[in-house]
């Protein structure tokens, strides 16, 4: 049996005691692990860590960001079989479908690698008499998203 911890401020943490949920293998009907659930304090700690990291990430050049995402993509690819096996045991998907989910996750990361190119500002000359338009894209701060957990990976 394994335990899924929270990753906050660069380290794995068990979070608030007593808040967890079983992970069950639907094919065998048995518990295979536990996932720690976040409390309000855990979320506050994660947001505070992200706010502390924000200035450094905002100053990171787009090429460096792409390299970091490429490394993440390489790790997903390297561990594709292991990830697919986890999806199969936790969700009951057949292995081929689970591998497809990992592949779709890889495609999303590959798309994200190219996003820094879209972060460039624009200059449009003569939008009006003696008027030029300049746009500059800058990170604004920490955001959070509550997203579907089940696809892709």
Predicted regions and their residues:
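Conserved small-residue-rich beta-alpha loop and adjacent elements
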Residues: 122-153
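Hydrophobic face of amphipathic alpha-helices that form TPR/SEL1-like repeat modules
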Residues: 1-28
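Glycine-rich loop-to-alpha-helix module at the N-terminal edge of alpha/beta enzyme cores
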Residues: 32-119, 130
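Secondary-structure boundary/capping motif
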Residues: 15, 97, 152-153
């Amino acid at each position: 049996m394994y335990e899924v911890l929270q990753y906050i401020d660069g380290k794995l943490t068990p979070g608030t005691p007593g808040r967890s949920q079983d992970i069950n293998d639907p094919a065998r009907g048995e518990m295979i692990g536990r996932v720690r659930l976040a409390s309000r304090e855990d979320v506050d700690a994660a947001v505070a860590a992200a706010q502390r990291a924000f200035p450094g990430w905002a100053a990171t050049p787009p090429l460096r960001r792409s390299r970091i995402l490429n490394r993440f993509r390489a790790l997903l690819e390297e561990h594709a079989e292991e990830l697919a096996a986890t999806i199969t045991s936790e969700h009951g998907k057949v292995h081929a479908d689970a591998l497809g989910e990992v592949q779709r996750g890889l495609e999303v990361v590959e798309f994200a690698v190219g996003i820094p190119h879209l972060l460039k500002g624009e200059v449009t000359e003569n939008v009006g008499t003696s008027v030029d338009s300049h746009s500059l894209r800058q990170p604004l701060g920490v955001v959070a998203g509550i997203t579907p957990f089940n696809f892709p990976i």
